[in-house]
């Protein structure tokens, strides 16, 4: 275990001694979240992230109405004898508005609402006539729906995995959403997945199978990004009875 994970694991262990709770994590998105093609290891970021969190000592429960990938035959292997928690809310090919339109139904069926929601949406909206209608308004609605179930939910909004012109034009909109929707008790933060991202397939350092879907390298990069974004909230969430989450006073 690297020093950063070791330090985090020690903090998590201390929280457990004081009385811990399970942190509910909702992976919400499109194919980047669902994955699961059987012809390639399309495990998504969820797979390495889950084991990173467990290795760091956190009691996490991935939630969602889905467990399968795009193809039912796709599998996620155990790691060091530990099974992967495959629950998620990823839907291959869906737009932001389509996810928004089904979210209330999904949330009503979860045993408990998420403490942290990881959102990866917008890739299927890049050809939309209006990003305001296709991305901004649905994402704001999604944040509002999540808060109806948990006023303290932490929302981590992933940037599109691309560096093309259309993806770049969407970036300031996501930053605007975060600024306008974050509150002292319910943070909304962006995750800059596009940094150090190489989408051209076939290169030794490529992060995708096909320009869009992360390969093993890309999946690990996304997991690293999400883990770093989650860290300011994990200890507080795990040791809190009500799941109140906000940044440390020093930040």
Feature names for model-found ranges:
Residues 14-19, 52, 100-114, 144-150, ...:
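Surface-exposed acidic, glycine-flexible loop patches that form ligand/cofactor-binding
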Residues 4, 115, 152, 188, ...:
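Generic low-complexity segments that are intrinsically disordered, proline-rich and/or Lys/Arg-biased
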Residues 1-67, 234-251:
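N-terminal secretory targeting modules
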């Amino acid at each position: 275990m690297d020093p950063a994970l070791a330090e985090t694991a020690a903090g998590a262990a201390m929280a457990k001694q004081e009385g811990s709770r399970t942190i509910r994590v909702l992976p919400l998105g499109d194919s980047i979240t669902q994955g699961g093609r059987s012809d390639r290891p399309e495990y998504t970021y969820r797979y390495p992230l889950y084991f990173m969190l467990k290795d760091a000592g956190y009691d996490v429960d991935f939630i969602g109405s889905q467990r399968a990938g795009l193809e039912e035959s796709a599998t996620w292997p155990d790691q060091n004898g530990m099974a992967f928690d495959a629950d998620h809310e990823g839907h291959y090919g869906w737009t932001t508005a389509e996810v928004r339109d089904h979210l209330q139904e999904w949330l009503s069926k979860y045993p408990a609402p998420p403490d942290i929601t990881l959102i990866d949406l917008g890739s299927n909206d890049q050809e939309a006539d209006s990003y305001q209608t296709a991305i901004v308004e649905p994402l704001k609605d999604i944040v509002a729906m999540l808060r109806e179930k948990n006023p303290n939910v932490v929302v981590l909004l992933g940037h599109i995995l691309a560096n093309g012109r259309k993806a770049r034009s969407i970036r300031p909109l996501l930053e605007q959403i975060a600024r306008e929707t974050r509150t002292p008790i319910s943070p909304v933060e962006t995750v800059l997945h596009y940094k150090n991202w190489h989408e051209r397939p076939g290169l030794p350092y490529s992060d995708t199978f096909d320009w869009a879907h992360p390969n093993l390298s890309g999946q690990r990069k996304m997991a690293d990004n999400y883990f770093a974004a989650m860290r300011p909230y994990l200890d507080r969430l795990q040791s809190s009875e009500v799941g109140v989450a906000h940044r440390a006073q020093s930040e």
